[in-house]
From Swiss-Prot:
GO terms for molecular function: hydrolase activity, acting on ester bonds; succinylglutamate desuccinylase activity; zinc ion binding. Binds 1 zinc ion per subunit. Transforms N(2)-succinylglutamate into succinate and glutamate. This is Succinylglutamate desuccinylase. GO terms for biological process: arginine catabolic process to glutamate; arginine catabolic process to succinate. It comes from the Bacteria. Pathway: Amino-acid degradation; L-arginine degradation via AST pathway; L-glutamate and succinate from L-arginine: step 5/5. It comes from Shewanella sp. (strain MR-4). HAMAP family: Arg_catab_AstE. The keyword Zinc applies. Zn(2+) binds at H63, E66, H160. Its EC number is 3.5.1.96. Belongs to the AspA/AstE family. Succinylglutamate desuccinylase subfamily.
Amino acid sequence: MLQALLDSKDFLALTLANPETLGDEFSFTLGEHTRVEVWDTGVIVFEPVQAQGKDVILSCGVHGNETAPIELCNTLIKQLLQQKIIAKQRTLFLIGNPLAINNGTRIIDENMNRLFSGEHSNPPGLVNPERVRAKKLEAYVDRFFKGAAAGRQRIHYDLHTAMRASKHEKFAIYPYRPGRAYSAEQIMFLAASGVDTVLFHHEPTTTFSYFSSEQYGADAFTIELGKVYPMGQNDMTRFIAAQEMFMRLITDKPLALEPFSADKVNLYQVCRVINKHFDDFEFTFATDVENFRSFPKGFVLAREGGQEIKVEQECESIVFPNAKVPIGNRTVICLIPSVAPDVR
């Protein structure tokens, strides 16, 4: 495995050729500046000999068909392995769901991004590949963040693409973080990366980014970088800004961020989440409606169990509508425009 990676510098190819395991962990050094550790398939760490003050996680492929972030991360990994760029921050790359990537599908059995914060082991337990992998990914995050001295800034960007078109092509979900201010620097980093829209979540979830935020105090985000396309069919020029900013972060180059101003970004507050309670749940709007579509107050969004679900507030908009989820799961997130909350 080691020689294959040293020869190809293609960690994604190695991962997809061995989607369940790489066998034993292995490590090697790049020049005299970086120790590289491979902990598992899709799990690679860059440890600078003289690390600066940030611990950075870039995860992708939690959903197997969201390919642009996978290609983006593999490009960064390849540049690091080729020593075209040199890591100055401790950096962990996670390719989340290799089995689903090989399958060309969002999932194998279950939505992995609903299985963190221990949800993977709640009944029915570790019964499918996503649950097993989510538990492992949690352990790798724990090992990485605890592998350095306390007091360092912890960052986790969980990269995705959306199943539908969007009024705002690139957007981020800021996990619920009671008692902690939102980071002005992080919001402006996202803006510089081309992610000009931020949703502030209103409650705990079982997403990967919430796990890192809540358990480790990380500046963590679920970041949607555009629309789903098959592997190799992404227009990677649309991700130049994001790739450049991630590279600057990892290599400790100046970020040159603008000061925070609410008029430079689109801010939304999650006002409610609508879950599915009956098999007959259906939306009233077209299946191809774009993310951030708004509806007038009183508009009937959906019907289930003989009841109507209506828009409750003026200027309420929606993201991630999906009626074809299991009972108990989220069908849509509802948003309202937000004045900047506690941003510092």
